[in-house]
A protein has these predicted regions:
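A short, N-terminal "cap"/entry segment at the start of jelly-roll beta-barrel domains
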Residues: 1-49, 63, 129-135
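Conserved short histidine dyad/triad with adjacent acidic residue
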Residues: 35, 52-67
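Short strand-connecting beta-turns/loops that link adjacent beta-strands
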Residues: 47-49, 69, 113-114
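Glycine- and acidic-residue-biased ligand/ion/polar-headgroup-sensing regions
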Residues: 69-71, 75-81, 86
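Structural motif
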Residues: 80-82, 89, 105, 115
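Short acidic-glycine-tyrosine-enriched beta hairpin
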Residues: 87-102
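Ligand-binding loop in jelly-roll beta-barrel domains
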Residues: 102-128
């Protein structure tokens, strides 16, 4: 008989590779606050990969920064973001993504009047690898 895993087990499964696969969502993932009233949920968090769902209210922005080791991929679920990477600005709409190589100075902002939801996929995880820029 197959093992039935409850969604409540998702937080533990998001942090280990030995746990069986379980559904994970914002409802059962580890949550944190960042920037201008923004939210993040760790959907996957291990030593090799992180997948975070993030929420940015209208007008919010993060601090320009870079990661020495982590490459990142931002995939927009709803709304659109303005991504600045090495001084170049790109509007990224829902259903699209943008790759940020390691070492690239970048900043994501929500210039619209609508909230934005997006995924940030980092390999390796970017925690502890962030260097904020003087702006």
């Amino acid at each position: 008989m197959p093992r039935i895993t409850k969604p409540a087990d998702a937080k533990a499964a998001a942090q280990t590779t030995s746990a069986p696969p379980v559904p994970v969502s914002r409802d059962n993932a580890e949550h944190y606050r960042w920037g201008d009233d923004c939210d993040g949920w760790f959907l996957v968090r291990d030593k090799n990969l992180s997948v975070i769902e993030e929420f940015m209210p209208p007008g919010a922005a993060e601090i320009r920064h870079h990661h020495e080791r982590a490459q990142q991929f931002f995939y927009i679920l709803s709304g659109e973001v303005l991504m600045e990477a090495n001084g170049e600005k790109t509007l990224v709409p829902a259903g699209s993504g943008i790759r940020i190589p390691a070492g690239t100075r970048h900043q994501v902002r929500n210039p619209s009047s609508e909230a934005v939801r997006f995924l940030v996929i980092s390999q390796p995880p970017s925690r502890g690898d962030r260097i904020d820029e003087n702006v």
